[in-house]
């Protein structure tokens, strides 16, 4: 029998792998793993993104900017109803990203994702990456 922490970790790993925005079936994975009213806190934004449909729309727009982006899992830790993982992401900016036209430049940064899981579904999540570093690597702001 698996423990709650083991189940939650498995959900997080599936989300990180199959729910990654360049995976052709990521939206199906999100349907299976997320609550319909999931709450997403993106990079310390003042207001969260609420609801599965809104989360999908936002995620789709992010991955249009870096259609070849890939991630490497570095660490994963779970306790109780929470799982946090750190990945290295890298890709080429060939589409619009957060209102910025394509630069053709590559980026490589670390990011963190924290998931709160309730009843085997992602109920809330936080994502943090250094967007200043991304913009510097794209040549949009000076170092």
What spans do the regions from the language model cover?
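C-terminal and inter-domain tail/linker signature
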Residues: 1-143
């Amino acid at each position: 029998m698996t423990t709650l922490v083991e189940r939650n970790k498995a959900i997080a790993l599936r989300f990180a792998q199959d729910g990654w925005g360049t995976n052709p079936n990521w939206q199906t994975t999100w349907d299976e793993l997320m609550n319909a009213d999931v709450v997403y806190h993106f990079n310390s934004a003042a207001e969260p993104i609420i609801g599965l449909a809104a989360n999908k729309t936002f995620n789709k727009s992010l991955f249009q900017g870096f259609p070849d982006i890939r991630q490497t899992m570095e660490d994963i830790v779970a306790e109780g109803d929470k799982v946090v993982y750190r990945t290295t992401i890298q890709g080429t900016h060939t589409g619009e990203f957060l209102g910025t036209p394509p630069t053709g430049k590559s980026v490589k940064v670390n990011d963190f994702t924290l998931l709160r899981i309730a009843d085997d579904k992602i109920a809330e999540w936080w994502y943090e990456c250094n967007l200043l570093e991304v913009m510097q690597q794209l040549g949009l702001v000076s170092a």
